[in-house]
């Protein structure tokens, strides 16, 4: 009974193993190791021989459990599910992609327009996806308004007769103010209305050196004092 069970299970295993290849089936039938399948050792030896021959004749590809050749191209299967590593006519080689890129550039610039320099191309491509990466154009400068231009325009707008009338109607106080301003423009500007400006001569040093005696040199004062003291001692 156990021998019958062993032989039956061995026959089933052998049938499943030999289903994959008809050539191996015929070779196993003709092999001397598979002639007697009554014992367990002969059965295992036949299975090993058939399995070894199957692995040598039929290549085993990774990823298929039935040990059959892949139906699709292995090169396409390797990284085809990634967007940046697809194999194709455009990205098959670096030389092909460079040639195609060069042909596209020639088609774009074929109308006679000057081709941009590589530095400009790099500058436009390097940071164009950032808002602050684009090269800044000319800065807008504020418009300067010159008072002389406004005066000239007003002078052109008024005739000569009206200008004479306006000059004759000027008050006296305004003329004096204008004259004083003109004098100030000629000389140096003094900050007289501030406290830290130069004080008048009569108020310098607290009024100590305002008299004529104060203008005498200090050596003369000491000399006079010494002479007076000597004269008093001599009396």
Curated annotation (Swiss-Prot):
Q: Where in the cell is it found?
A: Secreted
Keywords per UniProt:
Acetylation, Amidation, Cleavage on pair of basic residues, Endorphin, Glycoprotein, Hormone, Phosphoprotein, Secreted, Signal
Query: For the modification Phosphoserine, which residues carry it?
Result: 154
SMART domains (UniProt xref): ACTH_domain, NPP, Op_neuropeptide
Q: Which residues are glycosylated?
A: 91, 152
Q: Which residues form the propeptide?
A: 103-121
Identify residues that carry Valine amide.
Answer: 136
Question: Which stretches are tagged as biased composition: Low complexity?
Answer: 90-100
The answer, when asked if Metal-binding is one of the entry's keywords, is no
For this UniProt entry, the molecular function terms from Gene Ontology, in alphabetical order, are: G protein-coupled receptor binding; hormone activity; type 1 melanocortin receptor binding; type 3 melanocortin receptor binding; type 4 melanocortin receptor binding
Q: Which residues are the signal sequence here?
A: 1-26
Main localization is secreted
> How does it get modified post-translation?
Specific enzymatic cleavages at paired basic residues yield the different active peptides.
> What is the similarity comment for this entry?
Belongs to the POMC family.
Q: What is this protein called?
A: Pro-opiomelanocortin
State the organism named in the record: Mus musculus (Mouse)
């Amino acid at each position: 009974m156990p021998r019958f069970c062993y032989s039956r299970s061995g026959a089933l295993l052998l049938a499943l193993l030999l289903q994959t290849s008809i050539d191996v089936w015929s070779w196993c039938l003709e092999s001397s190791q598979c002639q007697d399948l009554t014992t367990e050792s002969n059965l295992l030896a036949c299975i090993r021989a058939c399995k070894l021959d199957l692995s040598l004749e039929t290549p085993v590809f990774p990823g298929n459990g039935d040990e059959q050749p892949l139906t699709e191209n292995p090169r396409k299967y390797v990284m085809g599910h990634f967007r940046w590593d697809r194999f194709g006519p455009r990205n098959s080689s670096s030389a092909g992609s460079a040639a195609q890129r060069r042909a596209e550039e020639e088609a774009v610039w074929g109308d006679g327009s000057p081709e941009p320099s590589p530095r400009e191309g790099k500058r436009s491509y390097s940071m164009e996806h950032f808002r602050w990466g684009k090269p800044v154009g000319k800065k807008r400068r504020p418009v300067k308004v010159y008072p002389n231009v406004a005066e000239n325009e007003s002078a052109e707008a008024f005739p000569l007769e009206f200008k004479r009338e306006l000059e004759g109607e000027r008050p006296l106080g305004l003329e004096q103010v204008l004259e004083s301003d003109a004098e100030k423009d000629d000389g140096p500007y003094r900050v007289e209305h501030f406290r830290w400006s130069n004080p008048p001569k009569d108020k310098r040093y607290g009024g100590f050196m305002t008299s004529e005696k104060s203008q005498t040199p200090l050596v003369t004062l000491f000399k006079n004092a010494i002479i007076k003291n000597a004269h008093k001692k001599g009396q």
